[in-house]
């Protein structure tokens, strides 16, 4: 597939590409860029998820390697369920993703987020993020900002660390994720 067709496929039904010139350069330089989307497995995969799922399918068709992060630790920090509930949803998500025919590498957050390198990266990000910037990012994540916890403030920093340490070239998300991804 030529570069123009790849770019057209990647841009299809996309609200925003934050750095389109960088995307064009990436497609010139890298035959198989790594694309990623992260999901909190806090309930069943639903119709709303299909927006990003279909974009991941477009990226696969455009020759990208796709990773899906099942962010179990994020779900715990964001108070979206008890550990056993989230573990069950992880199993359900894996089955559903497979049934949808996506050939993505599925990565479980807890498989790498407790490692020293990851924790050090989150701490470095915390050192360079102001409280105000962190609160703005957190407002996109926490439903009840007046009763938000410190763990929810940690969440956006983890999203940035996920992207960096998973070797991601293209991050797929909703428009609410753009505020978090500005840290990259």
Region spans (language model):
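NTP-dependent nucleotidyl-transfer catalytic core
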Residues: 1-184
């Amino acid at each position: 597939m030529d570069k123009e067709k790849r770019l057209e496929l990647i841009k299809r039904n996309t609200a925003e590409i934050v750095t389109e010139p960088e995307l064009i350069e990436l497609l010139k330089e890298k035959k198989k860029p790594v694309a990623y989307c992260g999901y909190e497995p806090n309930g069943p995969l639903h119709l709303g998820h299909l927006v990003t799922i279909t974009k991941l399918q477009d990226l696969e068709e455009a020759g990208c390697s796709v990773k899906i992060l099942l962010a179990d630790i994020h779900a715990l920090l964001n108070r979206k369920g008890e550990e056993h509930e989230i573990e069950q949803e992880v199993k359900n998500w894996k089955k559903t993703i497979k049934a949808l025919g996506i050939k993505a590498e599925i990565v479980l957050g807890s498989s790498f987020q407790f490692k020293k390198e990851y924790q050090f990266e989150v701490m470095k990000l915390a050192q360079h993020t102001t409280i105000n910037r962190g609160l703005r990012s957190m407002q996109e994540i926490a439903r009840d900002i007046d009763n938000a916890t410190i763990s929810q403030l940690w969440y956006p920093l983890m999203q940035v660390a996920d992207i960096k340490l998973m070797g991601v070239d293209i991050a797929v998300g909703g428009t609410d994720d753009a505020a978090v991804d500005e840290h990259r």
